[in-house]
């Protein structure tokens, strides 16, 4: 704490001295520029700015594919402000260190897209040109935290700031220009995984068809796969306006369970909550003229469900149990869902059609 107060005092002293000198710039970032320059001096940052005016503190070159302006970057990162306060992160260790770890939350690399206007200018300046496997720690001044693109630092300095200065510590895990195919390929790798368990069986053993390993080409429709786990008691399709009851468990491709109606499963995966009722949920079986399954809803309040979940149900018959695996366009797309499902995440749902609860 003393070091922080001392640093702030030194910065204030430098700013006071600078106020007597001729102003280097004018405009909305005049004070920001003076403060930033003073902060660099107090913290002995002696590196020269590069690109638009970012300061690269550490850099390890990757050996994989180069990040360009037309794709999707999978990366781990930690961001902090100039005072050292962590403002965002992807890693589980950081969450644990901050006392913010939640078992059901997702921790790991996340996708951002690199298209023009989707990244802050300074962040894009740091990321574009990096290669998969590369690492960089960089300081990005507040005037470069803008989604607009200009040709020079002076043009950014003339704009109103949108965000404070940022220290960005990033590692590139992967890069693709074809995100849907990337997800489908990930599903294919999941089918062949020997370590992830599906109801106590390795995924590689579950996803077999007549003794042959399921492949990405075995989709029922693009990005959607279904595997029967228990045969139905009747192969007749459900009539319209039918109500059925199911138990389900939702997972990501790494085997992490994020939601379930089964109490034992919740406890086994350490996501149990005493505030939640673990019991079969009602499914309202209906259809629409356009896609057949779009009218399926959940609960007495007819809650809408994601397409992949509905499409899994659409494959099923009375008392059947099965597993649906699908890419994010049939799930939560680029936005993900809360803290448990990241953007561009394929999902797995194990669904068990059961008898109506007696109560």
Model-derived features: positions:
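Sec-dependent bacterial lipoprotein signal peptides
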Residues: 1-20
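Cross-family detector of peptidyl-prolyl cis-trans isomerase
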Residues: 5, 20-359
């Amino acid at each position: 704490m003393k070091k922080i107060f001392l640093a702030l005092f030194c910065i204030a002293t430098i700013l006071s001295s600078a106020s007597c000198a001729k102003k280097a710039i004018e405009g909305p970032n005049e004070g920001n520029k003076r403060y930033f320059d003073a902060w660099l001096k107090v913290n002995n940052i002696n590196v020269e700015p590069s690109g638009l005016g970012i300061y690269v503190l550490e850099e390890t070159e990757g050996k994989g594919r180069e990040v360009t302006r037309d794709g999707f970057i999978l990366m781990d990162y930690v961001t902090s402000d100039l005072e050292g306060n962590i403002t965002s992160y992807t890693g589980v260790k950081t969450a644990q260190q901050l006392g913010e770890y939640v078992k059901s939350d997702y921790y790991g690399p996340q996708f951002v897209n690199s298209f023009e206007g989707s990244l802050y200018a300074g962040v894009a300046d740091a990321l574009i040109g990096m290669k998969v496997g590369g690492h960089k720690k960089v300081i990005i001044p507040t005037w470069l935290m803008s989604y607009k693109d200009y040709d020079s630092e002076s043009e950014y300095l003339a704009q109103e700031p949108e965000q404070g200065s940022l220290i960005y510590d990033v590692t590139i895990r992967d890069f693709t220009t074809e995100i849907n195919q990337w997800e489908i390929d990930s599903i294919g790798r999941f089918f062949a995984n020997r370590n992830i368990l599906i109801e106590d069986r390795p995924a590689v053993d579950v996803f077999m068809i007549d003794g042959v390993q399921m492949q990405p080409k075995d989709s029922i429709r693009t990005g959607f796969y279904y595997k029967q786990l228990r045969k139905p008691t009747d192969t007749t399709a459900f009539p319209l306006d039918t109500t059925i009851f199911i138990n389900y468990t939702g997972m990501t491709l790494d085997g992490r369970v994020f939601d379930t109606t089964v109490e034992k499963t919740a406890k086994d995966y350490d996501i149990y909550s005493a505030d939640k009722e673990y019991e079969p949920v009602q499914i309202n079986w209906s259809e629409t003229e356009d896609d057949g399954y779009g009218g399926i809803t959940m609960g007495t309040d007819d809650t809408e469900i994601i397409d992949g979940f509905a499409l899994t149900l659409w494959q099923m018959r009375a008392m059947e149990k099965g597993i649906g695996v699908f890419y994010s366009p049939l799930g939560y797309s680029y936005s993900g869902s809360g803290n448990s499902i990241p953007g561009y995440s394929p999902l797995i749902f194990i669904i068990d059609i059961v008898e109506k609860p007696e109560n």
